UniProtKB/Swiss-Prot annotation:
Involved in mRNA degradation. Catalyzes the phosphorolysis of single-stranded polyribonucleotides processively in the 3'- to 5'-direction. Its cofactor is Mg(2+). It catalyses: RNA(n+1) + phosphate = RNA(n) + a ribonucleoside 5'-diphosphate. Its EC number is 2.7.7.8. Mg(2+) binds at D490, D496. PROSITE patterns: KH_TYPE_1, S1. GO terms for biological process: mRNA catabolic process; RNA processing. The keyword Nuclease does not apply. This is Polyribonucleotide nucleotidyltransferase. Keywords: Cytoplasm, Magnesium, Metal-binding, Nucleotidyltransferase, RNA-binding, Transferase. InterPro entries: ExoRNase_PH_dom1 (IPR001247), ExoRNase_PH_dom2 (IPR015847), ExoRNase_PH_dom2_sf (IPR036345), KH_dom (IPR004087), KH_dom_type_1 (IPR004088), KH_dom_type_1_sf (IPR036612), NA-bd_OB-fold (IPR012340), PNPase (IPR012162). Coiled coil: none annotated.
Length: 721
């Protein structure tokens, strides 16, 4: 195959897609270039059909350190398991392409995105999604694309397509949108409290801008695309059984079984009804062909269950737990359930329950994030845990799944927007969401529980954040938007639309759409309905914690800050770090910055205060005119040396000790004597001349040191060099 390159303009920069040059043995492969960011994307499928009853699709996002001219920092100096950034980038692509595989397609399919070059300005995540669409479109893999993906920022009130990394730092919006020619099928966003109308406008803007990419991929497919292979679909015996089984199920109490309030009771009732109907139709399960008939009846019953649930929602505005489409489940909240945690809260909404826990740490607890954008330190961590008992199941307990990473990132983006600036609240913050029960919207409950735990810890957040998951049931022109969806409604519905924000605006958004035809008008309606629910939830949260606690939790560590002259940092550190080690031995961690900012961290407030006072003493600077209660530490024929504060002495000349002539210093002062002194002068070398305040104006002042040719040598000529 001859290599061919196709180009289009996107966001004012050229996007080029080349095929036929690299990885030619893959079913589909393309190379994308945008600026100096270069990606290789391949798509491959097995010939044999999987025995799984779902689509075995995997998307891998491979970050190569050579892409930015670096050697990996791991022990073996090679890339290891994908990090969080790579997982989130892979999920963007997965969520965009998965809904467009044909019904019944079960071949194991793999998309691999490899970052070959990264200019650290043009993000590779959305390019990977475009590349996956192109590779699948050109391959022989059955797929109903293409799709395209863009990022939208908002700078100075204007939408910007694919903002650079530098531009994103000034953007109030970070929105990723994927879609087909006629519809949007995936949205992901983090925002600084923008309005719902701004979001809809950004989504519409993105959908218009991605049309050029769709044109490009369709041109490529027409010119160099391969013919799609045929795939086997299991004969669906269940379809013919649905009409009769549906009538029988309704007569046998399907409605009552579906409208059981509790999840486990509902599942048990539906299973009992299904088993009874199957037993009536297959009296002898051991007979020839009975197993196939039973499986077909189970599949048919699942379809009947879905049809009836959707009918109840659309025609009667009645949901499985008895609510209408706009009602939020009952909410129960408890603040500070954990006595030793820095902040904690339990948030329960229906049968979804999350324990949120906040822990405060120092800069030494920052997470070093090493990816292709460079090394950064993350001062806000949010970890989402989804144990199997939360859904009443037994599964292997191990590392985080990709789902957990994605849900945790959504909650993190929602809350990060309201955190105080580090200069105002110099703590590293970790929030953990422990999902204790799950029947839909556990990530949104994590946002609520995490926010409450921050407020319980005394973190001065700008405003409380709440989240709610919205759903959609759509049949032709008829649709109904659902507030606070159940797990069952998520599985059987047409949209999962998670919205997080404050009372003023949206801070995070995630939308996955399973059907085409979701118009901007429907999105506006869903966002408006989500706002009503969000305000309701925020009201319930305010009943328990109307604002962050005025003081940090008694168990939380204390951080004291002070500013010193940068030239005095050496005094705090000491020779070889001796002084700072002595300070930390007092029970605190000390962080010193080059600009003189010092932070003292200790679980013991008294220890932190003691270290602060010690540092102030070490770095205190004397000023002309200040008075001190000092102690004589040394005498000399010409005067006495008086300690003003730790590390700082001054000299009281013999002529300034009394109104009368003093023959010997020891006639007036001795080591250990305390007296009141005042700073009269500080020379260029930092030497301090003292006077006694009570004698000021009664005796002639001494000339400043700089004016005395002989220094303190009693008028004798200076020493020869």
């Amino acid at each position: 195959m001859i290599a061919k390159t196709y180009t289009t303009m996107l966001g004012g920069r050229e996007l080029s897609i080349e095929t036929g040059k690299l990885a030619k043995l893959a079913s589909g492969s393309v190379t994308l270039r945008y600026g100096d960011t270069l990606l290789l994307v391949t798509a491959q499928a097995r010939e044999e059909r999987s025995t799984l009853d779902f689509l075995p699709l995997t998307v891998e996002f491979e970050e190569r350190h050579y892409a930015v001219g670096r050697i990996p920092g791991s022990f073996h100096r090679r890339e290891g398991r994908p990090g969080e950034h790579a997982i989130l980038s892979a999920r963007i692509t997965d969520r965009q392409i998965r809904p467009l595989f044909p019904k019944g397609y079960r071949q194991e399919t793999q998309v691999i995105i490899t970052v070959l070059s990264a200019d650290q300005q043009n993000a590779p995540d959305v390019l990977g999604a475009i590349g996956a669409s192109a590779a699948l479109s050109l391959s022989d893999i059955p797929w109903n694309g293409p799709t395209a993906c863009v990022r939208v920022g908002m700078i100075d009130g204007e939408y910007v397509i694919n903002p650079t990394s530098d531009q994103l730092t000034r953007s109030s919006l970070d929105l990723v949108v994927a879609g087909t020619r006629d519809a949007v099928n995936m949205v992901e966003a983090g925002a600084q409290g923008v309005s719902e109308e701004t979001l809809v406008g950004a989504i519409e803007f993105a959908h218009r801008e991605l049309q050029g990419v769709l044109d490009l991929i369709e041109t490529m497919r027409a010119e160099v695309g391969r013919e799609k292979f045929n795939f086997l679909v299991d004969s669906d015996l269940s379809t013919d059984l649905v009409p009769e089984l549906s009538e029988a199920a309704r007569a046998a109490g399907l409605r009552d079984a579906l409208l059981t309030t509790k999840k486990q009771e509902r599942s048990a009732n539906l299973k009992a009804l299904r088993d009874r109907l199957i037993a009536e139709r297959v009296p002898d399960p051991e007979a020839a062909g009975a197993a196939e008939q039973i499986e077909a009846l189970k599949a048919a019953f699942a379809k009947v269950e879905k049809q009836e649930l959707r009918r109840l929602i659309l025609q009667e505005d009645l949901r499985a737990d008895g609510r209408n489409s706009k009602t939020v489940r009952p909410i129960w909240i408890e603040a500070r359930p954990l006595p030793r945690a820095h902040g904690s809260a339990i948030f329960t909404r229906g049968e979804t329950q999350v324990l949120g826990v906040t822990t405060l740490g120092t800069e030494r607890d920052e997470l070093l994030v090493d990816n292709l954008t460079g090394e950064t330190n993350d001062r806000f961590l949010l970890h989402y845990n989804f144990p199997p008992y939360s859904t009443g199941e037994v599964k292997r307990v191990g590392g985080q799944s990709r789902r957990e990473v994605g849900h945790g990132n959504l909650a993190k983006r929602a809350i990060r927007a309201v955190l105080p600036a580090f200069d105002d609240f110099p703590y590293v913050i970790r929030v953990v969401g422990e999902v204790l029960e799950s029947n839909g919207s556990s990530s949104m409950a994590t946002v609520c529980a995490g926010t409450l735990s921050l407020m319980d810890a005394g973190v001065p957040i700008q405003a409380p954040v709440a989240g709610v998951a919205m759903g959609l049931v759509m049949e032709g022109e008829q649709y109904r938007i659902l507030t606070d969806i159940l797990g069952l409604e998520d599985a059987l519905g047409d949209m999962d639309f998670k919205v997080c924000g404050t009372a003023e605006g949206v801070t995070a958004l995630q939308m996955d759409i399973k059907v085409s035809g979701v118009t901007p008008a429907i999105m506006r309606e869903a966002l408006a309905q989500a706002r009503e629910a969000r305000l309701h939830i925020l009201g319930k949260m305010a009943e328990v914690l109307p604002a962050p606690r005025p003081e940090l939790s008694p168990t939380a560590p204390r951080i004291l800050t002070l500013k010193i002259n940068p030239e005095l940092i050496g005094k705090v550190i000491g020779p070889g770090g001796k002084q700072v080690r002595e300070l930390e031995a007092m029970g605190a961690q000390v962080t010193i910055e080059e600009d003189g900012n010092i932070r003292i961290f200790s679980a013991d407030g008294a220890a932190a205060e003691a270290v602060r006072q010690k540092i102030e003493g070490l770095t205190r600077e004397a000023k002309v005119g200040e008075e001190y209660e000092g102690t004589v530490v040394k005498t000399a024929p010409f005067g006495a040396f008086v300690n003003l504060f730790p590390g700082q002495d001054g000299m009281l000349h013999i002529s300034q000790m009394s109104e009368n002539r003093v023959n010997a210093v020891e006639d007036v002062l001795n080591v250990g004597d305390r007296l009141r002194v005042k700073i009269a002068n500080i020379d260029d070398r930092g030497k301090i001349d003292l006077i006694r305040p009570e004698l000021e104006g009664k005796i002639a002042p001494r000339e400043p040191r700089a004016a005395r040719a002989g220094g303190d040598r009693g008028g004798r000529p200076p020493r020869r060099e």
